[in-house]
Amino acid sequence: MNITIPFNHPPIVGTELAYIQQAMASGKLSGDGAFSRLCEQWLEKQTGCQKVLLTPSCTAALEMAAILLDIQAGDEVIMPSYTFVSTANAFVLRGARVVFVDIRSDTMNIDETKIEAAITPKTKAIVVVHYAGVACEMDSIMALADRHRLWVVEDAAQAVMAYYKGRALGSIGHLGCYSFHETKNYTAGGEGGALCINVPNWIERAEIVREKGTNRQQFFRGYADKYRWQELGSSFLLSEIQAAYLYAQLSVAEQINRRRLVVWQRYSQALRPLAERGVAEFCEIPTACQPNGHLFYLKLADESVRSALIRHLAECGILAVFHYVPLHSSPAGKSFGRFVGEDRFTTVESERLLRLPLFFNQTDEQVERVIGAVKEFFLS
């Protein structure tokens, strides 16, 4: 079986090598160099975040968030089960218990109306996941967190350049985490991430945590005569080579964003009749949300139809894939967490969701081939 249209192809804009060569010539490769500063400044301007720090991955950003929130053994952290394992791992590593709640069927995001019932005296934080770059209902979640004096972390791995009521995702919670993995809209050469710090008096501490728990940044700025181990931390810097690759992409981020939205809209327009016939459902975009075209999915009647469509597309040379297996159904999810309330949508919706190819360098001809193959399946 020859796959000629991959599910994903890392974005390439053409200036990456030139920027990497500049970074190599600078003699500064280990991070926090000129390209790191350019990326962080771009993200701060784009999002309005108080401070953005590049990290080796979104996983690392989430782990930094758990340290900054001083997560301790026995604390509870509320999140959706329909997410990537890093969302939970970051907090479990600090000793927390994960409390899963159900998702909304329209957006696949955490159901904001189910959170309050999961809050206990041990609850420390709420982690929201903006699935497919579509925002969670942030106003009600932030109001709930404020009433109960809880922290909110945005897992915005898929949500760079996506907005909620005009506010950049990642800038609304107390902390926000981005991914620049090769599957995301913008990549730092395969792996990468960023932590958005929206509480000003956490910025200095975040720099310490990021530098292995030392005040190295203060030393470089001349605020300390030597740097010392201050507290718990780890090596959370992105290399300057990767920052150079990322800056090439951020420099044309609007172009990448526009192209992905064009592909997303073409899928939506061409496949809308399937929804009208009742054989498939699409992601619904709430009016408060401005998405970024991160991914396009169909929801089929059930898992067997999804499997049949995957096989049909593969026979047409097209790779389409499903997504997360809910964490609460996994061995580690059962060991380190619990599901509160009814699992009305998490499992059943995850079993019928299928993602179609969508990437920046995808040609119009490839898009039309995918559309044609999907339509053919439902006509057969």
Where are these predicted regions, by residue range?
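Helix C-cap/helix->beta junction micro-motif
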Residues: R94, R147-H148, C316
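Conserved PLP-anchoring active-site segment centered on the Schiff-base-forming lysine
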Residues: E63-I119, A125-V127, H312
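Phosphate-binding glycine-rich loop
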Residues: L29-E76, A90-R94, F100-D102, R167
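N-terminal "arm"/small-domain region of PLP-dependent enzymes with the aminotransferase-like
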Residues: M1-S30, R228-Q230, P357
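Nucleotide-sugar donor-binding loop of glycosyltransferases
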Residues: D75, S81-T83, D102-R104, A156, ...
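PLP-dependent aminotransferase class I/II
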Residues: R37-Q41, Q46-V52, T113, A117, ...
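Active-site phosphate-binding strand-loop segment of PLP-dependent enzymes
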Residues: D106-A188, A194-N201, R355
